[in-house]
Structure formats: structure tokens, C-alpha cells
A protein has these predicted regions:
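Helical element adjacent to the flavin cofactor pocket in flavoenzyme catalytic cores
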Residues: 92-149
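C-terminal catalytic lobe of FAD-dependent flavoproteins
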Residues: 108, 198, 202, 211-212, ...
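Flavin-dependent oxidoreductases
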Residues: 129-218, 222-232, 241, 250, ...
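Short cysteine clusters
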Residues: 352-354, 389, 394
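Iron-sulfur (Fe-S) cluster-binding segments and ferredoxin-like electron-carrier domains
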Residues: 358-369, 392-410
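Low-complexity, small/polar and acidic-rich linker and loop segments
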Residues: 407-434
Length: 435
């Protein structure tokens, strides 16, 4: 979700960068061919007592520069979203809010960076850092890296990473949020991002369409230790019950996946951006809880400005390679499909039937500037496994393609993170039956 920016307190970095980031995101998604839809959002008042809070959010948003907001009556709200609860008394309409494919958004920008000379080291954990003359030395697997500046964007670990060089003056509170993803049969239940009035735990449980046509519902907010992304029955029940206050008719029997993420909440209600006098050249970008995704491009501008002030950035590259085209086979016309298959026959072989993802799209994901090398890596780049069966049909074929294209032993192929091997052993080794 790309939030409009009415929730952060006026005058905070979060408020300023949220509004700026959403405007930049629209430009970036158009330039880099990222799935994006400016559908707008509604914050509901579900009883008369919540109506003053809508006015408060409207005043916040006005101070923050959020465009086009309007407080709607009950009748206006239900006219826009007829499946909402009959208890709705009104809503705050924010037309600048949008939905985006978050993995594609991040990967597209990373691909452009790599294309223009950035060296990307994956699964490369920083285990120590020390200040040296003119910069820092980072300890990583297999050696060290010396650099003039460090940008600490380590998410839920940002305070611990900062503490490698100086005691951190902020504390990250890892907070888990659980979600339901529902089948496309539920994708038209609402047309806009639906919020309830926010509380001390955050923006609350939302109901929203996705750019792929599904319905997403969540999250809750539960402090956890580290990166605990497990789902709980109590957490999912809370999400379900709370969401039905907004949209009672959601059919959770159409859920195709539940999942959780951990956001980097802070002990202060703002982003941490910048250097400390005790650690010059060490730039923290920390506490990027919601609206972190919304603000991300504007946060990057802040980091660039700091690097420019330190004189570590040269002139803009004359041969900078911008732009991106992502082929989505199912969205092509019949003529375009025929021409593409004639040129590249792999696009004529459908691997994921739920989402109509072709072998050609998977091969593109395996050989991009930031190539996939896991089942979920392919899923996030190409969409294979995103559908109703969640990879039950196409998963084995995707594994075969990874093995064939990247030369990885099938037993070494991961679902996602280290230790998530899909296969544990061979059967009928040497052609002899175990039976």
C-alpha cells in the first residue's frame, strides 16, 4: 500500500517523506514498468464517536500537503463501496493512495542500480564494523570491506548494526503483522484501500485489492523477538474479526495464503535518518515502519543529499541506463503473443496455469540483472506460484528450470531462505525401487 500521508504528525520526517514518496512512486512505476494502480483510500468511521477523528486526519493531511482529500457522508461512502458495513457513518477519502507490487517495485530499482555498476552481494551478513581512518571496515563472510560511508538500512537489525560502531540512540521494536491473501474471486469485494480509524498500534486492519486482482486483509501488530514471521491462530482470528467490521461479506473460505512480516517499529514515532557526530559517514535509515514503502524514494533522496554533502558522489553518469520493460504474457494481445512466441518459443509454454506464467517469463527472472535462484525468488519476479494453488502444480517444474538454467543440484534448491531446501533426498537411486 502506498499511503496518502494524512496519518503522520505534521512536521515529522515521516509526514514530509510520505507525501513526497507517493508522488515519486507514480513516476518510478511508470518509468520502470512496475504494476501500480492509484485507487485511493477510505478511512471509515464505524460509529459517531469516530467522526471527529476523520476531521483530525483531514487536518493532518492538509498540513502535510496531501492532495484531494474529502470527508464523505455515509451515503457517499456506501455509494463508492456498497459492500461496506451498514454501521459506516462517514469516511475520509484520499485519492492519492495507491497499490503496487512491492517485490517488483524494489527489484526494478535494484535491477537499474546493478545495470549501472552497483555490486550486489546477497546472503552477505555484516558481523562486525569498525571505524578506520577515512571510513569504516565491515566484516563479512570471507573477509572485509572498506568504505568511506555506510548506509545502515538494516531494518529490524538497524539498531544492532549501528551499535557495532557507536551505541545507538534509537531502539527497534520488531513488530509482526499477519495477513490473509484471498483468491481473485474475492478481488472485487472492494475497489479502494479500506482502513478503520488508526489507533496506538498503527493504521489497523485494512482490506484492499491487489494489483494482481486478489484481496489482501491485515495486519495485526504484535511485538516479537527478531524476525519471527510465523502465523498464529489468534493473530489471524483477530485480523479476520476486525476486517469483518469494515466489510462483513468477505468470504475467508477463499483464502489462498496467510503470511506475516516484521516491521521495524521505533521507540520514537518518526524515521531515523542521518549521521551522528560520533560516527561521521555512517548514515542511518532506520525505523522504516509504515509508511516506509510509501516514503522509500524520498528517503533515498535524503541519503543522496547527505552523500553529496560529504563529497563522495561524482557527477551524474552520462551513460546512465534507465528504464525497464517487464513482459507479462497474459496481458499481451493475441497478435503480440503470436509474435513473441515466434521469436522466443519459451513464451509459448505455460508453466503456472493459475496465473498464466510462461517458461519465457521464468527464464527472464533467472537471467535478469538480479537473478532469482530460489522457488520464491521466481515467484516474486515472474508470478509463478502466486495463484490459487500456490505452486502446487508449477512448483516442481520451476525447480527443474532453476536446476537446468543455473546448474544447481535439485537437492540444493531452496524455497526461500537458507535451510528451506525443497527436496531432502533422491528416491529409487540407481533405478532400484525402495519397495
Amino acid at each position: 500500500i502506498l499511503h496518502a500521508g494524512y496519518d503522520p504528525a505534521p512536521g515529522t520526517r515521516m509526514a514530509r517523506l510520505n507525501v513526497r514518496g507517493v508522488a515519486l512512486a507514480k513516476e518510478i512505476c511508470a518509468k520502470l514498468d512496475v504494476s501500480y494502480k492509484q485507487c485511493g483510500s477510505l478511512v471509515l468511521a464505524l460509529d459517531e464517536k469516530e467522526l471527529p477523528h476523520l476531521q483530525h486526519l483531514f487536518e493532518n493531511g492538509t498540513a502535510n500537503g496531501v492532495p484531494g482529500m474529502k470527508i464523505l457522508s455515509r451515503e457517499e461512502t456506501l455509494a463508492m463501496e456498497p459492500n461496506l458495513s451498514e454501521k459506516v457513518c462517514g469516511a475520509l477519502w484520499a485519492p492519492s493512495a495507491a497499490i503496487v507490487n512491492p517485490w517488483e517495485y524494489a527489484l526494478a530499482m535494484t535491477e537499474v542500480a546493478v545495470r549501472n555498476g552497483v555490486e550486489l552481494r546477497r546472503s552477505c551478513k555484516v558481523t562486525d564494523a569498525e571505524a578506520i581512518e577515512g571510513g569504516y571496515r565491515l566484516t563479512v563472510p570471507g573477509g572485509t570491506v572498506e568504505t568511506r560511508c555506510v548506509i545502515n538500512a538494516a531494518g529490524i537489525w538497524a539498531d544492532k548494526v549501528h551499535s557495532m560502531v557507536e551505541p545507538a540512540n534509537f531502539r527497534i521494536i520488531p513488530t509482526r503483522g499477519e495477513y490473509y491473501l484471498l483468491d481473485k474471486s474475492e478481488g472485487t469485494r472492494v475497489s479502494h484501500v479500506i482502513f478503520q480509524c488508526p489507533n496506538e498500534l498503527g493504521k489497523g486492519v485494512l482490506v484492499a485489492p491487489t494489483v494482481h486482482g486478489n484481496l489482501i486483509v491485515g495486519p495485526n501488530a504484535e511485538p516479537v523477538e527478531g524476525n519471527d514471521t510465523s502465523c498464529t491462530s489468534s493473530g489471524l482470528e483477530f485480523v479476520k474479526t476486525t476486517a469483518q467490521r469494515s466489510v462483513p461479506s468477505i468470504n475467508f473460505g477463499e483464502s489462498i495464503r496467510s503470511f506475516a512480516g516484521v516491521r521495524a517499529n521505533l521507540d520514537v514515532d518518526d524515521f531515523v535518518i542521518g549521521e551522528e557526530p560520533e560516527a561521521p559517514g555512517w548514515i542511518d535509515l532506520a525505523g522504516m515502519k509504515s509508511p516506509g514503502l510509501s516514503a522509500a524514494p524520498a528517503v533515498a533522496e535524503e541519503a543522496v543529499a547527505i552523500l553529496q554533502q560529504r563529497g563522495v558522489l561524482g557527477a551524474e553518469k552520462a551513460d546512465y541506463k534507465d528504464g525497464r520493460r517487464h513482459i507479462r504474457f497474459k496481458e499481451l494481445s493475441a497478435e503480440e503473443k503470436a509474435a513473441l512466441v515466434k521469436e522466443q518459443p519459451a513464451y509459448g509454454r505455460v508453466i503456472c496455469r493459475c496465473e498464466t506464467i510462461t517458461e519465457g517469463e521464468i527464464l527472464a527472472a533467472l537471467h535478469s540483472e538480479v537473478p532469482a535462484n530460489t522457488i520464491d525468488g521466481v515467484k516474486r519476479r515472474a508470478g509463478a506460484g502466486m495463484g490459487r494453488c500456490q505452486g502446487g502444480f508449477c512448483g516442481p517444474r520451476v525447480l527443474e528450470l532453476i536446476s537446468r538454467e543455473l546448474g544447481i543440484d535439485p537437492l540444493d534448491i531452496l524455497q526461500d531462505k537458507n535451510g528451506s531446501n525443497v527436496l531432502v533426498s533422491e528416491t529409487k537411486v540407481g533405478g532400484k525401487s525402495n519397495g
